A protein has these predicted regions:
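Chalcogenol-based redox active-site neighborhoods
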Residues: 1-145
Length: 145
């Protein structure tokens, strides 16, 4: 599962979601059954975003009221960007309902002036599964929102 601040936002759309979709077969070859994208958005927005990006392998999980995100301790205020309450970026490897590994972006805070994206990416999770270190974030895709 990976969580991100919002559908149709630049980093989420140009890199975070597309890269997990690109690497799906490789994740599968390392024993991952399903990749889930979670965002504090409603189901209609998540559906249209997935359709717009053409994702094929990602289960889109809306957390419309932020309940799951709040219980994970990852709900942050992003009113400085006009977003309201959103999820902080993180990814986690879950095996039989047990979190085995979690990558949380640095500088966790309400109204964070930046949008850190250096550890919840698909390449970092893949490197963890391979028992190596991440080569870094993949280049973003073009995104027209």
């Amino acid at each position: 599962l990976f969580a991100l601040p919002g559908a149709f936002t630049p980093t989420c759309s140009s890199n975070h979601l597309p890269r997990y979709d690109e690497l799906f077969e490789e994740f599968k070859s390392h024993g991952v059954d399903q990749i889930i994208c979670l965002s504090v958005n409603d189901a209609f927005v998540m559906f249209q975003w997935s359709k717009h990006l053409g994702t094929k392998n990602i289960f889109m999980l809306p957390d419309g009221n932020g309940e799951f995100t709040r219980k994970m301790g990852m709900l942050v205020e992003k009113s400085n960007l006009g977003f309201g309450m959103r999820s902080w970026r993180y990814s986690m490897l879950v095996n039989d309902m047990v979190i085995e590994k979690m990558f949380v972006e640095p500088d966790f805070a309400d109204n964070c002036p930046t949008d850190p994206f250096q550890s919840s990416d698909a390449d970092t999770m893949m490197a963890f599964l391979k028992g190596s270190t991440s080569p870094g974030i993949a280049k973003p895709h073009a995104f027209v929102g």
